[in-house]
Amino acid sequence: MEPIEQQLTELRTTLRHHEYLYHVMDAPEIPDAEYDRLMRELRALEAQRPDLITPDSPTQRVGAAPLTAFNQIRHEVPMLSLDNVFDEESFLAFNKRVQDRLKSTENVTWCCELKLDGLAVSILYENGVLVRAATRGDGTTGEDITSNVRTIRAIPLKLRGDNIPARLEVRGEVFLPQAGFEKINEEARRSGGKVFANPRNAAAGSLRQLDPRITAKRPLTFFCYGVGILEGGELPDTHLGRLLQFKAWGLPVSDRVTLCDSPQAVLAFYHNVEEDRPTLGFDIDGVVIKVNSLALQEQLGFVARAPRWAVAFKFPAQEQMTFVRDVEFQVGRTGAITPVARLEPVQVAGVLVSNATLHNADEIDRLGLRIGDKVVIRRAGDVIPQVVNVVLSERPEETRPIVFPTHCPVCGSDVERVEGEAVTRCTGGLICGAQRKESLKHFVSRRAMDVDGMGDKIIDQLVEREYVHTPADLFRLTAGKLTGLDRMGPKSAQNVVNALEKAKATIFARFLYALGIREVGEATAAGLAAYFGTLEALQAASIDELQKVPDVGIVVATHVFNFFAEESNREVIGQLLAEGVHWPAPVVINAQEIDSPFAGKTVVLTGSLSQMSRDDAKARLVELGAKVAGSVSKKTDLVIAGEAAGSKLAKAQELGIDVIDEAEMLRLLGV
């Protein structure tokens, strides 16, 4: 594998992890600024090598998948995200791109708004009556939060006024003002309840309560900023006009919305808002800048995951100084040992910060960090900040060096650092309690074996009570044993047992991904499954044979080979099969031999599928010899268009590319 391929793999793995924590669990571990930096780095590398862009890259999608505790709702019009800029130069470059695409030398009129730090929602009104509300989710599918949204007093249950469209989907942000956030935390401290890290987490936690009565007690509010579905009516032909119309119908709109007729005016707006930020009474992390004219918006169109006519201009991450009191070491799923700085607690952007990740030994060396040092930390709205630098001029005399452990802090096994890698790892494997927990959490996750209802807290208890040591042990659990866990009644226990039984029927690619082999993500697992066809063939493959799989280089091939060479891993796999885990035999990829209409073709999926998940469709297409791409180009052979297919479908039609619908895809797949 080329160095750039290795970088791309690591970046995508890291970004997917943090997307899950942020969008699904509402428990982010890194600041927005660090996530944005990682995304910029990934975009830059993919721009250098567009041939290495994969359909499942974070740059080719909108967000993350929703939880299954709520009913899922498919957005008829996808809820796209915005691209970001971080400085004046980048904004001016964006402004120029817009003018160049419009072939205009005249200034564009911009509509500028606050970028609220809350939770994006969609609210559907039919004949003026609120009938449905959903979270953004992954942009295509969200969670049904209608009952909770109805409790927010700022959101009208019925619109007022005349000429209201028959179906109108309003989009906006639910957020928690600072005063309400402080009140919730005060009450939590008194009652021993959960104290939220910041207003965004509090808003998300409040909005996603299964009991609407809890949501009703939280002082949530809402500003609208856009529209999705529009049927049986008309709206003004400018963005500002639409916001004013929403306000006339009784929907709340920020009073800081401003029209700017030049890029200089936009910059002035940005700096004014930045200056006023501490006095607003609620959290924002930048401003949103949109082309005001709807006709020009339509002319500009969209890229894969964002409109070309809008951008988020984000504020710089906020910084404070504090002291490092100690460094502890945490162990992850693959044995990676991560140093964590324990800080003298300090308020950063309204949140009390007491720890920061230090990533690895190289980062500690780069910083020249010692325990007791005064450091600058940076935070951009989330929980765990980053250490920017050491204030050497104020280094206390009593500092001491940070000593990386030679044995795992959890299980006592030896640690190793492979030459050329930055990460130090525990060699204990599944005898290590920390690795065991994280491995099992990965195994049951939605994109792996998809065991509904088996959350992190259940896994923690199962490992701590020594009920489970390997993934195979999960399938031996009984409802009686599960009932003994905290907050687990007989009905819930039986539901988990049923979910485990259901999960036994999987597909080969998911099973491989669930095993947690280093560097083997979903795309690589699908490629391995499709190429070798059977578990036996994959287990017997040499490193050279493994490298014949598309996008598998020497590093990944070595990890896969070593995994299957380990007797304990083969034993666990045998136990899983003995417990009834099974999958249909995949078709081996060989475009010359496969009798399939998809063999050797580059296929693009767009829109929502109703009969099959997108992941399963991709896996099946790959098994039948297709290459699934994330964007439409002249090299695309076929586009499969589901419901609410958007710009990809339009581009396919423009290029004269063959298009089929979901029903035809299922027929060709033999489903």
Curated annotation (Swiss-Prot):
NAD(+) binds at D32, A33, E34, Y35, D36, S81, L82, E113, R136, E173, K290, K314. The keyword Hydrolase does not apply. It catalyses: NAD(+) + (deoxyribonucleotide)n-3'-hydroxyl + 5'-phospho-(deoxyribonucleotide)m = (deoxyribonucleotide)n+m + AMP + beta-nicotinamide D-nucleotide. Its cofactor is Mg(2+); Mn(2+). It comes from the Bacteria. InterPro entries: BRCT_dom (IPR001357), BRCT_dom_sf (IPR036420), DisA/LigA_HHH (IPR041663), DNA_ligase (IPR001679), DNA_ligase_AS (IPR018239), DNA_ligase_CS (IPR033136), DNAligase_adenylation (IPR013839), DNAligase_N (IPR013840). Its EC number is 6.5.1.2. GO terms for molecular function: DNA binding; DNA ligase (NAD+) activity; metal ion binding. It holds the Pfam family Nlig-Ia. SUPFAM superfamilies: BRCT domain, DNA ligase/mRNA capping enzyme, catalytic domain, Nucleic acid-binding proteins, RuvA domain 2-like. PANTHER family: CHROMOSOME TRANSMISSION FIDELITY FACTOR 18 (PTHR23389), DNA LIGASE (PTHR23389:SF9). DNA ligase that catalyzes the formation of phosphodiester linkages between 5'-phosphoryl and 3'-hydroxyl groups in double-stranded DNA using NAD as a coenzyme and as the energy source for the reaction. It is essential for DNA replication and repair of damaged DNA. This is DNA ligase. The gene is ligA.
